[in-house]
Design a protein with these regions (language model features):
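Rieske [2Fe-2S] iron-sulfur-binding domain
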Residues: 1-49, 57
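C-terminal catalytic domain of Rieske-type non-heme iron oxygenases
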Residues: 35-39, 43-230
Length: 230
């Protein structure tokens, strides 16, 4: 259902269209269960089962720390998908790990995330957050959200949502979506700025893809990791 169409209006539209099918569509022949859904931030969230952790618990740090950015009018300005030749867990656990960024991406994302000495960590049972001061003022937030989401926020209101979606034992889909404040998302200057923003993030993600795919090859080679550092 379109997020801008109310339930009653959607029912009326569906009923009118069903009569035009050949043969006529009979809804009782397709007993589809209803799924709970709700809008929160720029997204519509759908629960595929009743036994889910409440959305408030999944997003509690987002609501606490960046509520103004999260609830402002936003437009999705870019979307990109690519296949990673590694399983989703390797990609998810390494892509935005804070110290990994500092070591592996010194000339890309680390320039925005800032020096390690300024790292401030926050966590709940489900969510982790890294907060660093941004060079342009305000704070840069990097969230890890269940089950395979990463959210990055810039102090002026831009958001990047990175999803690592499972495909097979040794591949996954990386989806990047960029959101900008609605008041500043139109026109040629905004389009050029969004292209530059996407280019910057892709430089980081190109580096990251090489790293996580090499980790997958290492595990497949029979590598046995050593003990954790004490």
């Amino acid at each position: 259902m379109d997020g801008g169409v109310g339930e009653a209006a959607a029912e009326q539209l569906a009923a009118a269209r069903e009569q035009g099918f050949d043969p006529p569509f009979r809804r009782q022949d397709w007993p589809l269960p209803s799924l709970p859904c709700r809008a929160d931030g720029p997204l519509i969230w759908v629960a595929l089962t009743q036994a889910v952790t409440p959305l408030e618990q999944q997003l509690n740090l987002v609501h606490q720390r960046v509520a103004d950015l999260w609830t402002q009018p936003l437009d999705q300005v870019r979307i990109l998908q690519r296949t990673l030749h590694c399983n989703w867990k390797i990609a998810h656990d390494n892509t935005l790990d804070d110290y990994h960024v500092a070591v592996a991406h010194p000339t890309t994302l680390h320039r925005e995330q800032g020096p390690v000495r300024d790292y401030a960590h926050h966590a709940t049972a489900l969510v982790n957050l890294l907060v660093t001061p941004h060079a342009d003022g305000g704070c840069f937030h990097t969230f890890g959200l269940p089950p395979w989401l990463h959210l990055i926020t810039w102090p002026e209101g831009r958001l990047a949502l990175l999803e690592v979606l499972p495909r097979s034992r040794d591949s996954c889909c990386m989806q990047l979506r960029l959101f900008a404040p609605s008041a500043a998302s139109g026109g040629a200057p905004a389009d050029a700025a969004n292209n530059a923003w996407l280019k910057e993030l892709l430089a980081f993600l190109d580096e990251d893809q090489a790293l996580v795919e090499s980790a997958q090859r290492g595990y497949c080679s029979g590598l046995v990791p050593g003990p954790p550092h004490g």
